[in-house]
């Protein structure tokens, strides 16, 4: 049976791989950051239980990383429309690079947030003046994931520009 698809047959594979990469790698970063900083919060909570709610900030910041991957995965998956029957390799590669940019940036940010959050909440229990410094470092680590999200959106918007319309 002849195919009615006018693009490259393998192109949607790369597009969906980009969506999966964005979500999987971002969630891996979020999971690592949440687990690593959560261990620090639990250890600190034994000594200073009154600081637990204040020290939950790294856990929340790590959890947000998964949302960035979800956003890019949804953008990519809505860009893969089989009804148009024209999804080319350029589009698939653009979506793949978009997903990898967002996902790997989220993974690296999650690792940074986890390590800084773990050490930061433990140090905050002993010296409360370190809280502001910890928050600033966490913000810069979160910015890494935001850079990936922005680049992912830009790359994803490039898909579809290969068609002569």
UniProtKB/Swiss-Prot annotation:
Membrane topology: Multi-pass membrane protein
Record lineage: Eukaryota, Viridiplantae, Streptophyta, Embryophyta, Tracheophyta
Domain of life: Eukaryota
InterPro entries: ATPase_proteolipid_c-like_dom (IPR002379), ATPase_proteolipid_csu (IPR000245), ATPase_proteolipid_su_C_euk (IPR011555), F/V-ATP_Csub_sf (IPR035921)
PANTHER family to which the protein is assigned, alphabetical: V-TYPE PROTON ATPASE PROTEOLIPID SUBUNIT
Single GO term (MF): proton-transporting ATPase activity, rotational mechanism
Protein name from the UniProt record: V-type proton ATPase 16 kDa proteolipid subunit
Family: Belongs to the V-ATPase proteolipid subunit family.
């Amino acid at each position: 049976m002849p195919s009615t698809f006018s693009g490259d047959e393998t192109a949607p594979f790369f597009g969906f791989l980009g969506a999966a990469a964005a979500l999987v790698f971002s969630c891996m970063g979020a999971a690592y950051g949440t687990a690593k900083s959560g261990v620090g919060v639990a250890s600190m909570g034994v000594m200073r239980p009154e600081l637990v709610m204040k020290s939950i900030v790294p856990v929340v910041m790590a959890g947000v990383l998964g949302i960035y991957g979800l956003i890019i995965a949804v953008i990519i998956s809505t860009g893969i429309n089989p009804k148009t029957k024209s999804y080319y390799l350029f589009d698939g590669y653009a979506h793949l690079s978009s997903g990898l940019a967002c996902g790997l940036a989220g993974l690296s940010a999650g690792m940074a947030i986890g390590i800084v959050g773990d050490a930061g909440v433990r140090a905050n229990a002993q010296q409360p003046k370190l809280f502001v410094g910890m928050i600033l470092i966490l913000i810069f680590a979160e910015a890494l994931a935001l850079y990936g999200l922005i680049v992912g959106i830009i790359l994803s918007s490039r898909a579809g520009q290969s068609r002569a319309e």
